[in-house]
Amino acid sequence: MVDPARARKLAKRIGTIVATAIDHEIKDPRLAFVTITDTKVTNDLHDATVYYTVMGEKVDSAPDVEAAAAGLEKAKGVLRSKVGAGTGVRFTPTLTFVADTVPDTARHMEELLARAKAADDEVAKARENAQPAGDADPYKEPRVASDEDEASPDVREAD
């Protein structure tokens, strides 16, 4: 076991090395739109999991996650050697690439929030012209007792 702070530092360094290598040294066109989002290292520093996202070639085009996964799998050996040279640890961790689902989850949450806002707007629009079911003012003020009310003919005091 190793210090968790050291594992976090190594994970951050591995993510930086892999991202730089993908951008500048690996010429695979399948990796052109790959972004490294996170890296986790096991406590024994033997395995590293690299999370990535793939953006579409255009804004409205779907990303090709399968091609990016195949490109990363093919470049795994080169990337591991770059990590070994860049980190200086005794044992170079094995790299595992996992497609990150955070952007998809965030997009789904944004869609749910947009639907909830539309439903709230619809309720607010219906509320604008609504009339109460009973009296217009359900909180009527209580009657104030006056002198005339006290001397009503129904209730007379005996003299």
Swiss-Prot record:
Subcellular location: Cytoplasm
Native organism: Rhodococcus erythropolis (strain PR4 / NBRC 100887)
Keyword Lyase attached: no
Keyword annotations from UniProtKB, A to Z: Cytoplasm, Ribosome biogenesis
Protein name: Ribosome-binding factor A
Assembly and interaction partners: Monomer. Binds 30S ribosomal subunits, but not 50S ribosomal subunits or 70S ribosomes.
Transmembrane stretches, start-end: none
Annotated gene: rbfA
Amino acid composition bias (Basic and acidic residues), ranges on this chain: 118-128, 137-146
GO cellular component terms attached to this protein's record: cytosol
